[in-house]
Amino acid sequence: MRVLGIDPGYAIVGWGVVDYAGNRFAPVDFGAVCTDAGVPFERRLDEVYTGVKEVIERTKPEVLAIEKLFYQHNQTTVIGVAEARGVILLAAAQAGLPIYEYTPMQVKLAVTGYGKAVKKQVQEMTRILLKLPAIPKPDDTADALAMAITFCHTNGNQLNRFTVRSVGPI
């Protein structure tokens, strides 16, 4: 199965495409769509949409795994990311891709086995699982690859699409 993972944003959209078969990962391609801060916001959204659409057309994924939006303290940032996420979801929907959303905790758990792992641990485990010589840069790209790995590890267990289980005392 070919999976496109995306770490949404409006300045940088990390993306990573992974093939997964027989419990083995093979990185296909990865990178980032970057927009210029000096450009009007609607133009940046167009660049995000066009960039993601091009990645989908070129790499032909079967599914999209994307980070679920969570509340941030800076409302301006969260609104901008939500709008960028909207054009990303539009590109995926137009391509007929099923869309799966994951929280940061689900990604940490799926990639490292620990839901409270730090970013560096997730990135290093992503590098190891994909047999890459170095952690991909920018960080958004590594995060997108981790998103694709999360789909692969949770595919088949539909409950993981909807819930985050916490481990701890009851």
Each model region followed by its residue ranges:
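Phosphate- and other anionic-substrate recognition elements at nucleic-acid/protein interfaces
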Residues: 1-170
